[in-house]
Amino acid sequence: MLALWILFLLGMSTLGLVLFAAFSNKKAAQYLPPSGTFAQLGTTKLHYVDQGQGPVIVMVHGLAGNLHNFTYGLASPLAKNYRVICVDRPGCGYSERPGYADSSLEAQADTLALLLDHLAIESAVFVGHSLGGAISLAMAQRHPEKVKALALIAPLTHLPDGPAPVFKPLDIASPVVRLLLGWTLAVPGTIYRMNASLKVIFGPEKAPADFALRGGGILALKPKTFITASSDLQQAKSSMPSIEEGYAGMTTPTSVLFGREDRVLSCKQNGEDMTDRIQGLQLTLVSGGHMLPVTQIEQSLQFVETVAGKATGLAS
């Protein structure tokens, strides 16, 4: 009898967690609904925001992020002179990726190539932040004819020995466990760790008060954000070695902007050391943390405009 009661209580607790996750998912969507356009690209339904006219810039966000990381402050100023396309990576934000689909970093780069084909765009400047930097590098290696230049902001370029402590809860190898946690404990855990996580991800700078809505932070309360981020973390482990092997043969003009006090990725390994790994790479170091597209908009804007101006012939 006691065993039955324990099973009953466990079942009710699990049901409560699932219902809370569903409620959180719904509220996040209500507060920050899709703001762009959808394109069916193979197995991926990609959500993107397309604004401005001129030479094309494609912006690729990082782990557990979404396109609002760029629309927060970078996209609109750039759109005065460029056509700026901010994407929700496959499975992130409002982009959809089935569980059976190839979710490697290379496959995500291929999806971006499909987006350019879908929009009849021959080539673009790619701006990649964090994990989006690694995917942009894969894009330049696999589809060099489609990449005019790379402007990488705090990019993942080197596979570390393990994930940053703030991302340890995402380090789950089993897709089944990942799914179960995503719809039970992940959202309460995210809420519990929110303030501590933001201090690391943004530190030593502070997360702006309006980041939840303007910067897309509230979408972290969607179960699929956890599920996709956990999957992406595993995919980075398997994809990065081959991406790193490709550095020596790259000819795409590549520039990197990195914060010296980045608490998520090593500035030395992912920034400073890259000058010896990719020929001609231009490195800019600033005082700051990992979320430069949000915390240092003017610096990031100047960086992207300089890279894009050289690549497209427009004055920076």
Task: Describe the residue ranges of each PLM region.
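Flexible "cap/lid" loop of the alpha/beta hydrolase fold
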Residues: 141, 150-182
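Conserved HGGG/HGGXW glycine-rich cap/lid loop of the alpha/beta-hydrolase fold
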Residues: 51-94
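Conserved alpha/beta-hydrolase catalytic His-Asp/Glu region
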Residues: 26-28, 164, 186-249
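Acidic catalytic loop of the alpha/beta-hydrolase fold
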Residues: 261-265, 291
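Active-site loop/oxyanion-hole signature of alpha/beta-hydrolase fold enzymes
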Residues: 42-43, 49-51, 86-127, 131
